[in-house]
């Protein structure tokens, strides 16, 4: 392939890493805003989500142009197609961070939202995201598979959070709205974990030409999409 094509691949790689870093920062700030009831920070996170949307469009445009101009095959083609998929998935991670802030901004509850499990989930998700991008950059199949498998732990953490909040609702039903908001925030983090796991699967495909468990992932994401739609309707 021409040198220009290799330069485009490198540009796309750098763009994806930058996008992932912004998604991690948005997730960090979203949870911080939520637990501290910092509405100004929440507004900033919501505003910056547009930047992530634009980055996705930029990456997709570069990849499509490269495919049209150079007609790559095999590994090069898989890399460009994977980049398009990853950028789309990162955009959804950014959306979920924004939606956590939306919960706060639409709420009239001023209670204490601080929850250690929520913080642990956030830290774990950001670690998953960082590992996914290391796997992408270094073409580390083993690490990409680890990212895929890490999602189970995040699911377990969400279950703990959910059960804890249900217990609190039973004990103190007057705080139903507050505890429900914490559940929704945790669900958006858990949803992002599923998305990052699917990024791990895509990286394995880029490296080997094979998916990990394609049908399982697609079915899980479909279920999560239905749940997310219901949550969004409640929060609208």
From Swiss-Prot:
GO molecular function: protein homodimerization activity
Gene3D superfamilies reported in the protein's UniProt record: Phosphate transport system protein phou homolog 2, domain 2
Keyword Transport: yes
InterPro entries for the chain: P_transport_PhoU (IPR028366), PhoU-like_sf (IPR038078), PhoU_dom (IPR026022)
Major location (coarse): cytoplasm
Pfam families per the UniProt record, alphabetical: PhoU (PF01895)
UniProt keyword list: Cytoplasm, Phosphate transport, Transport
GO CC annotation, single: cytoplasm
GO biological process, one term: intracellular phosphate ion homeostasis
Superkingdom of the source species: Archaea
Quaternary assembly: Homodimer.
Function: Plays a role in the regulation of phosphate uptake.
Protein name: Phosphate-specific transport system accessory protein PhoU homolog
């Amino acid at each position: 392939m021409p040198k220009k094509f290799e330069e485009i691949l490198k540009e796309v790689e750098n763009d994806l890493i930058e996008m992932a870093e912004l998604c991690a920062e948005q997730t960090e700030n979203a949870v911080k805003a939520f637990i501290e009831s910092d509405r100004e920070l929440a507004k900033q996170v919501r505003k910056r989500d547009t930047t992530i949307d634009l980055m996705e469009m930029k990456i997709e445009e570069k990849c499509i142009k490269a495919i049209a101009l150079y007609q790559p095959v095999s590994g090069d083609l898989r890399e460009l197609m994977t980049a398009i998929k990853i950028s789309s998935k990162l955009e959804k991670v950014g959306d979920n961070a924004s939606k956590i802030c939306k919960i706060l901004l639409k709420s009239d509850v001023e209670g204490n939202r601080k929850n250690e499990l929520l913080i642990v989930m956030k830290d774990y998700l950001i670690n998953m995201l960082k590992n996914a991008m290391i796997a992408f950059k270094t073409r580390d199949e083993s690490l990409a598979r680890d990212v895929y498998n890490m999602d189970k732990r995040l699911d377990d953490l969400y279950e703990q959070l959910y059960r804890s909040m249900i217990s609190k609702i039973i004990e103190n039903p007057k705080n139903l709205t507050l505890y429900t908001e914490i559940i929704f925030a945790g669900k958006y983090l858990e949803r992002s974990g599923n998305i990052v796991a699917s990024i791990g699967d895509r990286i394995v495909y880029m490296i080997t030409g094979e998916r990990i468990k394609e049908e399982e992932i697609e079915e899980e994401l479909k279920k999560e999409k239905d749940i997310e739609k219901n949550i969004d309707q409640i929060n609208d």
